[in-house]
Amino acid sequence: MVGKIAPIAVDAMGGDHAPGAIVQGAVNAARKGLPVVLVGPEARVREELARHRAGSSLPLEVHPATEVVEMHDHPGQAMRRKKDNSIRVCFDLVASGRAAGMVSAGNSGAVMAGAILVLGRPEGVERPAIVSVLPALKGSPLMLDMGAVVDCRPIHLVQFALMGEVFSRRVHGVARPRIAILSNGEEDTKGTDLTRAAAAALRRAPIDFVGYCEGRDLLTGEVDVIVTDGFTGNVALKTMEGTAKVVGEYLKRALRSTTVSKIGGLLSKAALEGMKKRIDWREVGGAPLVGVNGVGFISHGRSDALAIENAIRRAGDAARTHFIDEIARAVAPSHALLEVPANGAAAQQGPTPRRTAPPQT
């Protein structure tokens, strides 16, 4: 996407491979013209920059932060007690307008706490959510929440759907995103009290709500936004990651089992590399937060330089769309949608529209 923006603030001390891999990813992004400000202990960050021969001509700067949030730290307490930690300083830069967004591979709970504490929420937003981009057969469907809110109420799912619709449309360019709630079946009677109440409300929302989807639908690309509570979403995400790893290992063993299979593997190497790249979580880079007054991306704790570079790029892309400006307007009717109509229970709103295949582009 085009257009100049303020730099992306990157937590240089977040993640299992910090600061080395984080700094390398930031340098790689800067070499491609993406402005970056690295946040962390200045001497240590500059030492890493020297190792990567990051010259002064790059759009890259260092902003000091004297404290670090460790993975074992309590998120809320760390934000309050370590006021100069690298995560909080990143958000301070975003809040002041000196950064267009932030990226951290550190303590995800601390990132969420920092976002709420420093940036705040758009008017009407009950709880922010973590969004994941799924490696589907077609398109780039979103799934939320992925762990921010494990115990949800119907209002949370309704707002997740409305915020996800905005992100899909504004950031991913989907003209009319199809929204579904993850459930144990497509029938209206399936699900829980939580999902049925949310579904009844979303049928009245000004969005393309297509009802329930099942776990088998997550990677088909038939829907653009999949809504669930943070507990279920996180379990589903980790299940997909584990499945991809096991399938990859099975494939590797099969291609090495005989001479013929080894030859077949060599002949199909390009196709296999393309598939590997498609399902590689590092290509996504990070999971955006929605429901806060700023752009924030949470990267995997195991992120390497490639993942950080891609997270910086995606944070910049999101910042350019100014999607946050629309969030408050999108969630404004959410409470009214949950009110039970005078002529019947919320669950009795007629049949849910069935999904149809997306138009070919």
Swiss-Prot record:
Chief location bin: cytoplasm
GO biological process: fatty acid biosynthetic process; phospholipid biosynthetic process
Cell compartment(s), UniProt: Cytoplasm
Domain of life: Bacteria
Keyword Nucleotide-binding listed: no
EC number(s) from the headed UniProt entry: 2.3.1.274
Record flagged with keyword Cytoplasm: yes
Catalytic activity: a fatty acyl-[ACP] + phosphate = an acyl phosphate + holo-[ACP]
GO molecular function: phosphate:acyl-[acyl carrier protein] acyltransferase activity
Pathway(s): Lipid metabolism; phospholipid metabolism
One Gene Ontology cellular component annotation held by this UniProt entry: cytoplasm
InterPro entries: FA_synthesis, Phospholipid_synth_PlsX-like
Keywords on record: Cytoplasm, Lipid biosynthesis, Lipid metabolism, Phospholipid biosynthesis, Phospholipid metabolism, Transferase
Enzyme class: transferase
Family assignment from sequence similarity: Belongs to the PlsX family.
Role description: Catalyzes the reversible formation of acyl-phosphate (acyl-PO(4)) from acyl-[acyl-carrier-protein] (acyl-ACP). This enzyme utilizes acyl-ACP as fatty acyl donor, but not acyl-CoA.
Subunit structure: Homodimer. Probably interacts with PlsY.
Name of the featured protein: Phosphate acyltransferase
Originating organism: Anaeromyxobacter dehalogenans (strain 2CP-C)
Gene it is expressed from: plsX
